[in-house]
């Protein structure tokens, strides 16, 4: 039976703005309070989805969240009609309104951790929504994330869904941005690679000093248990705390893996040799041949990696076994990074081609190609059980671009977030979107 890696990309929501909400994310902080263009952001994301679909890759779409999140503001003490809640928040606590309007759910690499059926004890695909408890604006995402994933992957014969881990710092979980799976074939048992920034309970592990480590070892271990993964199929590694302090807030900013290949920066991990040996040994026992490509700091610095998002790329396997790297335009703008990529593809190695995409609206908030997608490895029968409304096709692309053109503003500033009309625009758009994607009622305004 054939198996596929399906990339489900996050559709950018109508309230995409530069709120500067993500401490430790250099791009998010440095572009704070600039004017944004939600329409352009959504169309840039859709263009990437269409391009991958046309290249022959399986591509899906993940719906955005309801924003402003009026229920979240009510939980913080604002009362009255929805319009009054928004106006009160704007007057009394603008940062809370900005947080409740964040379109950060577009970065669906943080939506959940996914384990394919070949790895799990019960032979189903397992999903655990990430609690994202490190940042308030993201911690409010997981209830809707769970409902959307449940509507996309509804068949309980094939799919199992777990609630987010306890929303406390000890179980800080950032989802697939700190998780990669290595395998010989997507349908065969593989090795799941969990990367953490600190341990909550074991003081022997070092931690960053400047920026927070968002993923704990204990959270990764809990997800592996929930998914029924075997010890032989799991490797845990610690991200280098010094790179977290340089703006590497998720592992997908400093490494990317796919199939049998890990592409990583020399400074990405602690105890790298031990980690590589464990990956090689465990994948070898599952019939795979683990290979790694290390980018030396002498050629690309950590700062270059963070500015260009070289590693926040998509590493994709072509039918002929060669690999393709999808990178943001910013890689071409960095001389050292671009020079490295040219030498990489001309060396006759595993990565043969680089494709560049303009994702500037997302990049200015600190999210590149890898942030925008959630990978789900599916067997043919499982893919057939996915809600067909969320699988990208040429007609769906056309419908979604028209939908964006109809509902999205082309300019949004912080003061616009206080406009109650924006809430109505967003709800109207999302109500239509759930019909387009055949999701049913998943948003609070549709349920309550």
Swiss-Prot record:
Pfam families: AstB
Active site per the UniProt annotation: 174, 250, 371 (nucleophile)
Domain of life: Bacteria
Single GO MF annotation: N-succinylarginine dihydrolase activity
Pathway(s) this gene product operates in, as recorded in its UniProt entry: Amino-acid degradation; L-arginine degradation via AST pathway; L-glutamate and succinate from L-arginine: step 2/5
Cleavable signal peptide: none
HAMAP family: AstB
Function description: Catalyzes the hydrolysis of N(2)-succinylarginine into N(2)-succinylornithine, ammonia and CO(2).
Protein name, UniProt field: N-succinylarginine dihydrolase
Species annotation: Pseudomonas fluorescens (strain ATCC BAA-477 / NRRL B-23932 / Pf-5)
Source taxonomy: Bacteria, Pseudomonadati, Pseudomonadota, Gammaproteobacteria, Pseudomonadales
């Amino acid at each position: 039976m054939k198996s596929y890696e399906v990339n489900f990309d996050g559709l950018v929501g109508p309230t995409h703005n530069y709120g500067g909400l993500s401490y430790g994310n250099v791009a998010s902080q440095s572009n704070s309070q600039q004017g944004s263009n939600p329409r352009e952001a959504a169309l840039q994301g859709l263009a990437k989805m269409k391009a991958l679909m046309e290249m022959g890759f399986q591509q899906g779409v993940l719906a955005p969240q309801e924003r402003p999140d009026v229920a979240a503001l009510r939980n913080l003490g604002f009362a009255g009609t929805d319009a009054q809640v928004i106006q009160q928040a704007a007057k009394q606590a603008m940062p809370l309104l900005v947080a409740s309007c964040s379109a950060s759910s577009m970065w669906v690499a943080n939506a959940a951790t996914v384990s394919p059926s070949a790895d799990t004890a019960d032979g189903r695909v397992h999903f655990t929504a990430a609690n994202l408890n490190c940042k308030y604006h993201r911690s409010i995402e997981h209830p809707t994330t769970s409902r959307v994933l449940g509507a996309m992957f509804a068949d309980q014969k094939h799919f199992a869904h777990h609630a987010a881990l306890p929303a406390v710092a000890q179980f800080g979980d950032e989802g697939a941005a700190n998780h990669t799976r290595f395998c010989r074939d997507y349908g065969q048992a593989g090795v799941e690679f969990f990367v953490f920034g600190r341990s909550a309970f074991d003081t022997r592990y070092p931690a960053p000093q400047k920026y927070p480590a968002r993923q704990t070892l204990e959270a990764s271990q809990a997800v592996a248990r929930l998914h029924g993964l075997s010890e032989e199929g799991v490797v845990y590694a610690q991200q280098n705390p010094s790179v977290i302090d340089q703006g590497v807030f998720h592992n997908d900013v400093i490494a990317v893996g796919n199939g049998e290949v890990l592409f990583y920066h020399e400074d990405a991990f602690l105890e790298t040799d031990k980690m590589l040996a464990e990956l090689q040994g465990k994948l070898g026992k599952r019939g795979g041949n683990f290979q790694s490509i290390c980018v030396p700091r002498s050629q690309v610095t950590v700062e270059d990696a963070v500015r260009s998002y070289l590693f926040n790329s998509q590493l994709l396997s072509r039918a002929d076994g060669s690999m393709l790297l999808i990178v943001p335009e910013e890689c071409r703008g960095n001389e050292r990074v671009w020079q490295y990529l040219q030498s990489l593809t001309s060396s006759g190695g595993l990565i043969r081609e680089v494709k560049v995409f303009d994702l500037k609206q997302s990049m200015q908030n600190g999210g590149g190609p890898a942030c925008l997608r959630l990978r789900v490895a599916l067997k043919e029968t499982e893919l057939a059980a996915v809600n067909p409304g969320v699988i990208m096709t040429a007609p769906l692309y056309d419908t979604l671009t028209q939908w964006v053109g109809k509902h999205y503003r082309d300019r949004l500033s912080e003061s616009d977030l206080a406009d109650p009309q924006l809430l109505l625009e967003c709800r109207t758009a999302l109500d239509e979107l759930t019909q387009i994607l055949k999701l049913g009622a998943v948003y609070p305004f549709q349920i309550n």
